[in-house]
A protein has these predicted regions:
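Flexible "arm" and connector segments at domain edges
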Residues: 1-62, 68-194, 198-261
């Protein structure tokens, strides 16, 4: 891999290129924090896709796209006199050092769980202890990830199940309440109860050290692979997918499962 000097030279070249684009390219010159935000979200998801696929070339490409957005926001900030890339890096270093006293100080933390507990305590100190525990959960997070973060933050202050196996009673209870509302045909109440089912299942995943977002995406990808197999099978046979019966589709689906798709 490259030396630190080579890496810093490449980063400097990147900032020079960005400066020139901001000055000479009509599109880059026109961008604002507001106009870039939707693209930033898209680029972040594209990086996540590459990470899930474990595609090194795509990861490199998408990391570059995300880095471009980070530097672009800093560039816009520097033009306003608010913040530049040095400020961003200095602030980040200060935060990392402050939140890792087990590395840069005398605090002991022998496990990842202990490190996380220390982080939450240190975050409260950063905020002078005046903010609520859940105030640090970004409101713009996707709901599934937000639920996980809410539960994790509550855990860090001791609000958690003493015996993780007890969560299954809660899951069954919530499913029962959801089924009851569905039978009553009350859409609003059924939606609320379904939310409770999801929240309890996400809690179960957390308690058993499963990332629910990763787990769901694995199932998404599995479904896509099997459905693509089904569709490709019908195309090769010259059949329209809609012409197949459910039983015929199930049979092809089972073939895909047997092939490990």
């Amino acid at each position: 891999m490259h030396t630190r000097k080579e890496q810093m030279e490449a980063f400097g070249r990147f900032l020079d290129v960005l400066d020139e684009l901001r000055e000479k390219c009509p599109w880059d010159r026109k961008q604002t924090n507001e106009s870039l935000r939707p693209n930033t979200i898209e680029e972040t998801y594209e990086l996540c896709d590459a990470l899930i696929k474990n595609d090194a070339k795509e990861i490199c490409k998408e990391l570059g796209d995300v880095l471009l957005h980070v530097a672009f926001y800093a560039k816009i900030g520097s033009e306003k006199g608010d913040v530049d890339m040095k400020d961003v890096c200095d602030r980040l270093c200060e935060k990392l050092i402050f939140r890792h006293p087990h590395v840069f100080g005398e605090v002991q933390a022998d496990t990842a769980e202990k490190v996380t507990e220390n982080w939450e305590q240190l975050k409260m100190k950063e905020k002078d202890g005046n903010k609520m525990v859940l105030s640090g959960v970004p409101s713009a997070l996707p709901s599934l990830i937000k639920a996980y973060r809410i539960q994790d933050k509550a855990r860090n202050v001791g609000f958690d199940w003493e015996d993780r196996s007890d969560i299954w009673k809660k899951v069954k209870e919530e499913i029962g309440e959801f089924e009851a509302e569905v039978e009553q045909m009350d859409q609003d109440k059924a939606e609320a109860e379904f939310g409770d089912v999801m929240f309890s299942l996400i809690n179960a995943a957390r308690l058993y050290k499963i990332n629910p977002d990763n787990a769901l995406e694995r199932t998404n990808q599995k479904f896509i692979r099997r459905f693509n197999y089904l569709e490709e099978h019908t195309i090769k046979a010259g059949i329209n997918l809609k012409e197949l019966s459910l039983e015929e589709m199930d049979a092809i689906w089972d073939e895909a499962k047997k092939k490990g798709l």
